[in-house]
A protein has these predicted regions:
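Basic, alpha-helical terminal appendages of large translation-related enzymes
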Residues: 2-6, 10, 19-63, 69, ...
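N-terminal Rossmann-like or analogous alpha/beta NTP/dinucleotide-binding catalytic cores
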Residues: 19, 23-277, 283, 323-324, ...
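Alpha-helical recognition segments enriched in aromatics with Gly/Pro capping
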Residues: 26-84, 98-99, 233, 237-249, ...
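Short glycine/proline-rich turn/loop motifs
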Residues: 79-80, 214-221, 338-346, 511-514, ...
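Glycine-rich phosphate/pyrophosphate-binding loops
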Residues: 110-125, 365-381, 767-769
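Catalytic adenosine-cofactor/nucleotide-binding cores of aminoacyl-tRNA synthetases and other
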Residues: 166-167, 171-176, 181, 185-193, ...
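Residue-level detector of well-ordered alpha-helical segments, enriched
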Residues: 230, 262, 266, 280, ...
Length: 880
């Protein structure tokens, strides 16, 4: 009997010697079911200090200390899109996640990152989609009869049914079954009046017909320009989507079509190194078993348990691969012999095209060299794509460390199912941006760990929108406190200073907690929790202590420092714009960043002495940069709002006529604006205000960095306070009791409310009264808060319409119904980034690192499992 001793050694049993090689290969595979030892990169002492930054590394399934090869310089490659269709929120989740980490490395930890992104513009999916688009267009031009269309749909149904037999993914299988049911139902559906039945069928069964046509005529396609046209179109769409999401462009953007010669040379070298072979068709395959049996190498480093998973391997090969010519089912294509109807390039092995996996290896290696600091992509790419990348690259270079840190973003699910094009359950980025801003979408992702599975739902959206509202409200208050402090400074010798409780120490403590959270694998969720705590502390210890007739310069300092710190962090995360206040670093003094320690004397939040000149700069505390268009519009529309107000009150008696005339005179004197004759030229109103107050012109201010915020906004803010002062005067008169006519009072109160709630809102201006009727009757001079706030936010802030509430209820019911579709046994199976082992019921038993789950964790999961059983039972009952 041949006895295996480990590491390829056997007892020498003669009668089993012929099988030694086979058994050796088998047992080697069994040995390699756990991840190999990972060696921490060695830091060069000459490169200076580095932060104790840990990143969750898929090569070890743990958080590892991040040490780049070259000091501060980080070499990073990210798998880009295969450009055959529009991008969806699953893509957004991945690219926003890595955009945030990249920003943190550069703007917080002071690393220099070379970020390379590829465009996969040669792929089976692109080939098939381009051919189908071409064939379906020709099909419609030929004006097929009804019998032909019905017959082609029937063929499409049969093709889907044949796919179902071999499909192992439960979600895809469920989708394919539902698609068969839909198409069968479609064939018996009568279109609406006057709608052509042929066009109706083609429109609603386009994919099925296109698949039928491709099977029959795809090989006849000779115009290879269609592949280029499709790829360039969707590449452009992708780049526009990324810009819409505020994602920083890559340092280097590479395309597969630009690397054909380099790919051929790369493949040839792998063949020369003995790890690939040429098949009779002219395709070149990677010899997985040869690689796995090499003492230097290890196949499937990321997902060792997937070695031999032919279903996943086949999915990585694409739909158009040649079957039956590999030495082993584990082997994968480096170069594919092109068949009729496919693009091709000449190579030593005949006409062909690159395999999917080799493309990334060649492009990354060409730009970044033989070892990458970071490689990243979605968790669904772990195996086979990324494991195959690692294998072929290490076979090319002859070493075992092509990537030091592999980062994988978690799945984005919708109703518990992975969002994907194959399941037709995706939401495009552009559709998402129709209902939510790019800032809100980014906040959705920041409120969750970048590597965890997260569900896109009504609740996650509400959390992000709610947090954005908190930020806007907080910064609005901080800004107004600066203006109040400016007012109090004019009487600072006569006013008592509000007691200070050393809020700065609280701020410093939060700064260090944020630093620790970002060192913990860029834990943005904890950082946002810190921001929430800080805002709550500021509310109770700063905002609540603002009192009339008190000098609040120290409180204003604390409010400004807090707002600035939050804005600096959010700027780094890509949430806040690069305003004057948001500039600078939020890293605490004494902390380590790439290159050394932040000096102890360094003020991470530099505070100036509270004086009147400082508050103009401090007053623009906002997530948004200030634009010329926004200033022009707000000034002009606020003038229109004021004109409506004075027209409403001027005829309410001599008292109010005198108030209006006095007010109009002061506005004319201070700002050169005639309230009874507001100019139609919107820009001219603002230019007039700037000229009258001896300020630089609008065009001159826009040429100065942050000139609109520092020079123009303080003038506009003073103007807005002047403009609303007439409303304050009217409210004081009403509170004095001097107006006895109840109808007159009603009209005046309505005019005041309209000014605040309708006309100023339409101007994008938020006016918040702080003085109550009692305060006004006592003669207390309590200035209202005012500022520019997005009109959509103001409208939604006043009230949620009944229609909106109904829509929300419908969405929740829809999500609940869709969630019930998943059997409880499959509820956790897609969460491979959280769990590594499951029992026969589908319940997780071990976490992603292979450790057994605690009793408390199992108890929580059991509750979720039982709840899903009930939802699934309800779902099944609804289908009866």
């Amino acid at each position: 009997m041949l006895c295996y001793l480990g590491r390829g050694h056997f007892f020498n049993t003669p009668n089993l010697r012929p099988y030694q090689s086979l058994l050796l290969s088998y047992y080697r595979k069994m040995e390699k079911r756990t991840q190999p030892k990972w060696f921490t990169p060695v830091q060069n002492a000459q490169d200076g200090q580095l932060p104790n930054l840990y990143l969750y590394n898929s090569l070890t399934s743990r958080k590892d200390l991040f040490i780049p090869q070259d000091g501060r310089h980080v070499k990073w490659y990210t798998c880009g899109p295969t450009v055959y269709d529009v991008s969806h929120l699953g893509h957004a989740r991945t690219y926003v996640a890595f955009d945030v980490i990249r920003r943190v490395l550069v703007d917080y930890f002071n690393f220099k990152v070379t970020y390379v992104l590829n465009i996969t513009d040669i792929d089976d999916k692109i080939i098939k989609r381009a051919r189908q688009n071409h064939l379906i267009s020709d099909y419609q031009l030929k004006d097929p009869d009804l019998a032909t269309v019905v017959g082609d749909i029937a063929k499409g149904i049969q093709k889907i049914k044949s796919k179902i037999q071999f499909e192992t993914d439960s979600d895809k299988k469920a989708y394919l079954n539902s698609e068969v049911d839909r198409l069968i139902s479609l064939l018996s559906t009568v279109p609406l009046d006057e709608e052509d039945p042929i066009n109706y069928l083609i429109l609603n069964a386009r994919d099925a017909i296109a698949d039928t046509l491709d099977s029959a005529y795809g090989a006849s396609i000779s115009d290879h320009q269609i592949f280029e046209v499709l790829a360039r179109h969707f590449e452009k769409e992708y780049l526009v989507d990324m810009e819409s999401l505020n994602i920083i462009p890559p340092s280097v953007l590479v395309r597969v079509t630009e690397y054909i010669d380099a790919i051929i040379k790369y493949v040839k070298q792998i063949i020369d190194n003995g790890f690939a072979y040429v098949a009779p068709s002219g395709s070149v395959y990677f010899d997985t078993n040869r690689f796995a049996s090499s003492p230097m190498h290890f196949y499937a480093k990321l997902v060792p348990t997937a070695y031999g998973d032919t279903n996943q391997l086949e999915s990585g090969e694409g739909e158009l691969c040649i079957t039956g010519e590999k030495k082993s089912p584990n082997d994968f294509a480096l170069w594919k012999a092109s068949k009729p109807g496919e693009p091709f390039w000449s190579s030593p092995w005949g006409k062909g095209r690159p395999g999917w996996h080799i493309e990334c290896s060649v492009m990354a290696s060409d730009i970044l060299g033989g070892t990458l600091d970071i490689h990243s992509g979605g968790v669904d790419l772990k195996f086979p794509h990324h494991d195959n990348e690692l294998a072929q690259s290490e076979a090319y270079f002859g070493h075992s460390h092509w990537v030091n840190y592999f980062l994988h973003s978690g799945h984005l699910t919708i109703s518990g199912c992975k969002m994907s094009k194959s399941l037709k359950n995706f939401i495009t980025i552009r559709d998402a941006l129709k209902t939510h801003s790019s800032r809100q979408i980014r906040l959705i992702f920041l409120l969750h760990s970048w590597r965890d599975t997260m569900d896109y739902s009504v609740d996650t959206l509400a959390e992000a929108v709610g947090f954005e509202k908190q930020l806007i409200d907080f910064l609005y208050t901080c800004s107004n406190i600066q203006f109040l402090a400016k007012q109090s400074l004019s009487n600072k010798h006569d006013l008592e200073e509000t007691e200070n409780d050393d809020f700065q120490q609280t701020l410093v403590d939060i700064q260090h907690k944020v630093y620790d959270a970002l060192c913990d694998s860029c834990d943005t969720r904890s950082v946002l929790d810190c921001i929430k705590v800080l805002m709550s502390e500021a509310d109770s210890r700063i905002f609540s202590r603002i009192e009339p007739n008190k000098c609040i310069s120290k409180l204003a300092d604390d409010a400004f420092a807090t707002g600035r710190f939050i804005l600096q962090l959010l700027r780094i995360f890509g949430v806040a714009d690069h305003t004057a206040v948001a500039a600078g670093s939020p890293v605490p003094s004494g902390a380590i960043i790439a290159g050394g320690k932040v000096p102890e004397h360094h003020e991470s939040i530099p505070l100036r002495e509270a004086d009147e000149s400082a508050f103009g700069f401090r007053s623009w505390l906002s997530l948004d940069t200030l634009t010329e268009e926004r200033l022009i519009s707000s000034v002009h529309k606020s003038l229109e709002a004021c004109s409506i107000f004075i027209q409403a009150i001027i005829h309410e008696g001599d008292t109010f006529k005198e108030i209006v005339n006095t007010f109009a005179y002061e506005v004319q004197k201070q700002y050169g604006i005639d309230l009874f004759n507001v100019q139609s030229d919107e820009r001219q109103s603002l230019e007039c205000i700037l000229k009258t107050t001896n300020q630089a012109s609008l065009s001159e201010s826009t040429c100065i960095p942050h000139g609109l915020e520092i020079n123009v906004w303080p003038v506009v803010l003073n103007f807005l306070h002047t403009l609303i002062s007439i409303r304050n005067t009217v409210r004081k008169v009403l509170s004095s009791g001097s107006i006895t006519d109840s109808l007159c009072k009603k009209r005046l109160y309505e005019a005041c409310d309209r000014f605040r709630d309708i006309d100023l809102v339409n101007a994008g201006i938020r006016l918040q009264d702080r003085a109550t009727a009692i305060d006004l009757s006592r003669g207390l001079d309590i200035s209202p808060f005012i500022g520019l706030v997005d009109k959509k936010f103001l409208i939604s802030g006043h009230s949620e319409s009944k229609t909106k509430r109904v829509e929300t209820k419908v969405i929740k019911e829809s999500v609940k119904q869709e969630t019930g579709r998943i059997p409880p046994s499959e509820l956790f199976l897609s969460e491979v980034d959280k769990y590594s082992k499951f029992d026969s019921k589908g319940m997780p038993t071990h976490d992603a690192s292979g450790n057994e789950l605690s009793k408390s964790a199992l108890k929580k999961l059991q509750k979720l499992y039982i709840a899903q059983e009930k939802r699934h039972a309800t779902f099944l009952k609804s289908k009866e």
